[in-house]
């Protein structure tokens, strides 16, 4: 069974978003997503200051099985990308909710996300 953390919100496309409390957010892919993809071999991250529109693909995670796009949950601006993933993409597998986060972003329009209970229901 996939780990789902109560302190995050989730998208239909299996990304998690953590509200940092200051109009900034941290984002990654869920435990369910990383398990389906398998061992990560590469993560293509956006650049700091990139502006991304809602539902646009802005990041790619590549595993031994497949490459998968990561989609924006809102209109946002990237403020940090997890550079540790350049050398250790496997952090997405071993620590998807902690060390394996993908980006931090600013946004005033993060809406329509699921809480942990709703996300668990779509996995069942």
From Swiss-Prot:
GO terms for biological process: glycine decarboxylation via glycine cleavage system. Binds 1 lipoyl cofactor covalently. Its cofactor is (R)-lipoate. The keyword Cytoplasm does not apply. SUPFAM superfamilies: Single hybrid motif. It comes from the Bacteria. The modification N6-lipoyllysine is found at residue 65. Residues 24-106 form the Lipoyl-binding domain. Keywords: Lipoyl. GO terms for cellular component: cytosol; glycine cleavage complex. Belongs to the GcvH family. The glycine cleavage system catalyzes the degradation of glycine. The H protein shuttles the methylamine group of glycine from the P protein to the T protein. The glycine cleavage system is composed of four proteins: P, T, L and H. This is Glycine cleavage system H protein. It comes from Vesicomyosocius okutanii subsp. Calyptogena okutanii (strain HA). The gene is gcvH.
